[in-house]
């Protein structure tokens, strides 16, 4: 399965800055009924721990345009509490994805927009995103415009 363009467009426009890789995993499970093939312990450019989820030929972080660096086994000790916390969240999400979505307002809004927003409108938002990024315009401005 390829990365979904509608989902990427919504994540980068209307929901920019609101989602993380756990949210993306939950959305993929809910919308596409797919579980990740692999879990990757990573850090972002600021050194903050984050779990990334690998699917057939893409990662959850790609929906958010995040550049994550996998951590080594030795580095896992440094991030042990964050790893435990996020793995517990993953278990909660996987246990009952429907309930998790119902109790998370931003994910409910995302799914509603994903299902109800027309392809034309999402394509228009994607085009605005491409133009803005080519001109170096900030994501926050793009989010407000979509």
Swiss-Prot record:
Homology family: Belongs to the orthopoxvirus OPG112 family.
Membrane topology: Single-pass membrane protein
Function of the molecule: Contributes to the formation of crescents and immature virions (IV). Interacts with phosphatidylinositol-3-phosphate (PI3P) and phosphatidylinositol-4-phosphate (PI4P) lipids in order to form virion membranes. Mechanistically, mediates proper formation of OPG125-hexamers, and hence the honey comb lattice and spherical immature virus.
Transmembrane helix found in the keyword field: yes
Originating organism: Vaccinia virus (strain Ankara)
Transmembrane segments: 10-32
Source taxon at top rank: Viruses
Keywords: Host cytoplasm, Host membrane, Late protein, Membrane, Transmembrane, Transmembrane helix
Gene name per UniProt: OPG112
Induction: Expressed in the late phase of the viral replicative cycle.
Main localization, broad class: host cell
Localization in the cell: Host membrane; Host cytoplasm
Protein name: Late protein OPG112
């Amino acid at each position: 399965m390829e990365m979904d363009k509608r989902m990427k467009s919504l994540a980068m426009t209307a929901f920019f800055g609101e989602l993380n890789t756990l949210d993306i995993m939950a959305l993929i499970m809910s919308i596409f009924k797919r579980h990740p093939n692999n879990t990757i312990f990573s850090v972002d450019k600021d050194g903050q721990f984050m779990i990334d989820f690998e699917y057939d030929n893409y990662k959850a972080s790609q929906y958010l345009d995040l550049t994550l660096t996998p951590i080594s086994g030795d580095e896992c000790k440094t991030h042990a509490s964050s790893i435990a916390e996020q793995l517990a969240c993953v278990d909660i999400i996987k246990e009952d994805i429907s309930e998790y979505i119902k109790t998370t307002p931003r994910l409910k809004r995302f799914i509603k927009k994903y299902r109800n927003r027309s392809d034309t409108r999402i394509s228009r938002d994607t085009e605005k995103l491409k133009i803005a990024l080519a001109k170096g315009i900030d994501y926050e401005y793009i989010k407000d415009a979509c």
